Amino acid sequence: SLYDELIYALIADSEQALLFCEKYSPLFDFDYVYEPAEDILGLIYISCKNIDSRKATGSYYTPTKIVKKLIEKLDIASDARILDPCCGTGNFLLQLPAHVRFDQIYGNDTDTISVKITRLNMVLKYDILSVKTLYEHITEADYLASDSKTSYQYIIGNPPWGYEFSESEKEKLRKNYRTASGKNIESYDLFIEKALRNLSINGQLSFILPEAILNVKAHTPVRTAIMESNSIRYLNFLGNAFDKVQCPCIILQLIHTGKPLSTVGMEVSDCSHCTTILTNRKISAEYFSFHTTDAEYQLLEKKLRKKADYFSD
């Protein structure tokens, strides 16, 4: 069966697997209940991975409550193409709404075991009968190295943070990505740049990212790329949302308009309040700041104009 094939694909050494079963036989005395849309396999896998390996690849397991928060802000059409370019074990794809069919979904990752777990998760959630279709939609591939021009209506996920590229990789990336121009190359900047190329007009990108992308100078090139032909639809300040990771993060949802950035209709949220920007603000790629309400922003603008008039006199 398809289940058997996918499970055996996960087991690299059958003898070692049998020894494990014998050694830890009490584990098999428990009654396990399948919870739909819960990525238990992925959680176990990422928990068992060496911490140094996780840091080197920038891989951290995204809490399901954050994934759900991201997905809930997307109004996904019934015929839309959806991509998670760094799908890990498939947690984001598992949380997609019930009306989404598997033939709309695409995911890839460079981690072999993660891809195998994603395939198994997809078979558990969706009525998939074709191995060929499964392997075509969930692939082991390097998104950043791909020259695919395929367009998607939604690109979602949690791209790697702080991936350690080799010197040869950096050389190749600098030829293909404007956000790779600095001394230190940040992986999530590259994923944003690449994803924006693959979005259809009015398509949406929604990533979980470090808050630093909004204001740290090194990320000016990616902010410039965002401003050129996209607008920010939703920004949620999550704080330190990852266990034992001291790094404030955000949900950043962009819409690819094909026009310069406009702040009109942008929703900004944090743990205490939510506001919608109704005016088109002056935004610089040097620093993205959206903490003020429209009234506060207009007051600040008024004070700045007065100061400018004073010095011009």
Protein language model features and the residues they cover:
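Short, conserved active-site loop motifs that form the nucleotide-linked donor/cofactor pocket
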Residues: 136
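Signature of N6-adenine DNA methyltransferases within the class I
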Residues: 62-66, 87, 93-94, 102, ...
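Class I S-adenosyl-L-methionine
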Residues: 1-124, 142, 215-222
